[in-house]
Amino acid sequence: MLPIVKRDSLLNGLQIIILEQPGSGRVSTHLRIGSGAMYDLAGKGGLANVTSKMLLRGSSGLAPAGLANLTEETGLSVEITTGWDSTDLKVSGPASELETILDLIGRLVISPTFDQKELDSFKSSLISELKEASPRDKETVRQAAIQSIYGSHPYGRPLQGTAESLTAITRPDLTYYHNRFYLANVSQLVIAGDATLDQVTKLARSKLGPWKKGDRVPATFRPPEPVGSRRLLLINRSDTEMGTAAIAQIGYSRRAADYYAAAVLTELLRETAKAPGATVEIEANPRVLAGPLVINVSSPQDRIAAVVEAILDEVGRIQGGSIPPEKVEAAKARLVSQMAERLHDKDETAEVILEIELYELGRDYLLNFATRVNAVTTADLQKAAQAYLKPQSVAIAVAATEEKVKESLKKLGPVSVMK
């Protein structure tokens, strides 16, 4: 059953979307601002993330201690996250506090103070966390592979930045990012719960009407340099019997015309790209621009090269057109089922609606989702496989003991050792 969605907008372009749940006694608000880490300034990776987190460290008439007191007194929960394409502020609480919630959202996004002492303290804590984190975990391997294929493109850097890039971020950088990208007309506010559209629109005019609008910044980045052959990076580690690998390549955009075929193809890979005794996870990251397609692998060190080779062979078979029809139908069914499950959860329903807006998927997206998935043909999958699967030009990062795996990895291509 599709959700009943009610809409309105403010003069500044802010879209208001309501999922009414009368009698629930609670409201969940989700504000999505249509810009994220993709727009970090050069050499200042992590700027979008720092900017968003600093909203909670002081705004007009609300110091950090005041925010803590407010949430405790009213029973509100506040969460802010930064992605590559968006910044998301979520505030939930009793329906009786709806005006307080919208007032808080307005204060946070319209007039943050970016206090210098708070910024210095926050940057210091982030840098300490990065330096104390294990350099050999799954994320390090994943990031090494992604950086290898994207190079200087924004997607090649860590979303949260590095110690060096965080050190370079200044208060004027935050002010610039906020002024340039925190715009009402590239944002949507979804409210699910015990509130009506008229009630929300009236309060939003008062609390969020002053939020400025501006020109949307296009994502006109130079594409990454093509990868001509496999790149193998070995991160030497000696304290474990398990090996970790990430196989990365440039995937597809969420706005791609062949998105449905690409999504079915990814689901098909999740079923077929497996190896005995190994953990294999396939991660697609469709974004405004083509995001990374990553296969994460964990296995005993003495088998890591063989497992990676087996996975690449399977990717090659699918790229070559060896696509089992029965597995295709199962992959389609899983995608349709996953969407149905998302729509049974109010928070996930809000997320789906925001994806529709952010990626301009069309108001008929949910109505036609199952039909479009099921319409994907074997020929469509073969075209998508040719477009998106490149087993001979992937980046492979492996964390394992050099003397145990280097020779076996050489069968896959030239190996560069990262000390």
PLM-predicted stretches and their roles:
Residues 28-95, 135, 157-158, 269-279:
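M16/MPP (pitrilysin/insulinase) zinc-metallopeptidase core fold and M16-derived inactive scaffolds
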Residues 188-193, 296-297, 329-419:
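C-terminal regions of mature proteins
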Residues 37, 246-250, 269-299, 418:
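A structural supersecondary motif
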Residues 151, 155, 159, 188-253, ...:
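An aromatic/glycine/proline-enriched structural segment found at the starts
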Residues 101, 133-183, 204-207, 238, ...:
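Scaffold signal of the M16-like zinc-metallopeptidase fold and its non-catalytic homologs
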Residues 57-61, 92-123, 285-342, 417-418:
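M16/insulysin-pitrilysin zinc metalloprotease superfamily fold
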Residues 13, 31, 49-51, 71, ...:
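Buried hydrophobic packing residues in well-ordered domains
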Residues 1-32:
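Mature N-terminal segment immediately following signal peptide/propeptide cleavage
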